[in-house]
Regions:
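C-terminal motif of bacterial Sec signal peptides marking the signal peptidase cleavage site
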Residues: 17-20
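Extracytoplasmic small-molecule ligand-binding "clamshell" domains
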Residues: 36-159
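Extended ligand-binding regions for polar small-molecule ligands
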Residues: 38-79, 211, 278-316
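Periplasmic-binding protein-like
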Residues: 40, 180-188, 255-293, 315-334
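Short loop->beta-strand "edge-of-pocket" segments that line small-molecule binding or catalytic clefts
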Residues: 94-98, 116, 197-213
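Beta->alpha turn/N-cap motifs
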Residues: 98-103, 140-145, 154-166, 190, ...
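Acidic, polar ligand-binding/catalytic clefts
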Residues: 124, 128, 135-199
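A ligand-binding cleft/hinge motif common to bilobed small-molecule-binding domains
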Residues: 162-171, 240-273
Length: 334
């Protein structure tokens, strides 16, 4: 972890400078007890919104299990396949939407001047199989709210950004078989007196807006005000500035926060299960099959386990690849 910490200090310094230059905006007053008097004047992160307790989730939340038909099995390209994969090959570069500040998963290492993390390595492995060159990748930074839109508009070929599979998303985006299984947990500063979900009522919980986790928070913590931010790094900053008391997120995400801030702790209870998959435009079946071929290859040749050991070995994330999830296709058994 020490080799990651050096680059992190520089990254945090840059992030702090950017946040310090952000314009102030009219913000809702924090509820009593969510912040000390000394921190009340600090503005919330740019674009953040604070909801009072009791706001209803927008859709039903299923804590475990996955209502999804599955992905498409890898197979050699056929003449009648869609042209998407061939167009990527002709371009000679894979355009991938990623995060730039999700430590351990996908973040900019300011010392090395490059993107690093588990999801970044997955993108490079896909490029390796496409072009025999893991560096043949152009990264585009995307936020949670724009992932499906950018895929639909063709501005990225694929998205690898902690994109969990849900029925609602699967109606708009094609998914690979999952590459990571994560459990939803609670992270809180050790000085806030939060030891379980029972301590959350009237305490402000932070979550990234327009994610599946927002529904989870509103379902499982109905008596907590909810701070909605643009990024998980903003959530971590909000807890450090006493604008939030806890963060609810996947343990793969929380692992990066814990590494950044040793004055926090992740509670042991798992609240839900999520499966991360590569997002791909609908009807781009050839790309789905190619990505799944890479996921199968890194599972079998030890690459997945090497990536996990390098980036997530200190986390509570499941240390084994999730099961392959494929749908039954016509003529599959003929």
């Amino acid at each position: 972890m020490m080799r990651r910490a050096g680059s992190l200090l520089v990254a945090l310094a840059v992030a702090a400078g950017v946040a310090g230059c952000a314009p102030r905006s009219s913000l809702e007053e924090l509820p009593t007890g969510a912040a000390s008097t000394a921190h009340e004047a600090i503005p919330l992160p740019p674009g953040a919104l604070l909801d009072g307790a009791g706001k209803q989730p927008s859709m039903e939340f299923v804590p475990h299990g996955l209502d999804w038909e599955g992905s498409l099995r890898p197979r050699p390209s056929a003449p009648d396949d869609d042209p998407a994969l061939e167009q990527i090959r002709e371009r000679g570069r894979l355009i991938v939407g990623v995060e730039q500040s999700q430590y351990l998963l996908s973040y900019r290492d300011m010392v090395r001047g490059q993107l690093r993390g588990f999801e970044v390595e997955l993108a490079r492995e896909i490029a390796r199989d496409l072009f025999d060159d893991p560096e043949a990748v152009d990264f585009r930074f995307v936020d949670s709210a724009s992932r499906a839109e950018l895929l639909r508009e063709g501005r990225v070929d694929i998205v690898i950004r902690t994109m969990s599979i849900t029925p609602e998303r699967a109606s708009k985006v094609a998914f690979s078989t999952p590459y990571l299984k994560s459990q939803v947990r609670v992270l809180a500063p050790i000085d806030r007196g939060i030891a379980s979900m029972d301590d959350l009522p009237e305490r402000t919980v932070c979550v990234v807006d327009r994610t599946t986790l927002l529904n989870i928070v509103r379902t499982l913590a109905p008596h907590s005000p909810v701070l909605r931010t643009r990024s998980w790094s903003d959530c971590l900053m909000a807890t450090q500035q006493f604008q939030a008391d806890a963060i609810i997120a996947d343990d793969a995400i929380l692992a990066g926060m814990l590494a950044q801030d040793p004055h926090t702790d992740i509670l042991p209870d798992a609240l839900a299960t999520q499966y991360y998959a590569v997002g791909i435009p609908l009807e781009h079946d050839s790309v789905v099959r190619q990505v799944n071929a890479t996921i199968e290859r890194i599972r079998s040749d030890g690459t997945w386990h090497r990536m996990f050991q390098e980036w997530l070995s200190d986390s509570t994330t499941d240390p084994y690849p999730p099961p392959l999830m494929y749908r039954e296709e016509p003529n599959e058994h003929e």
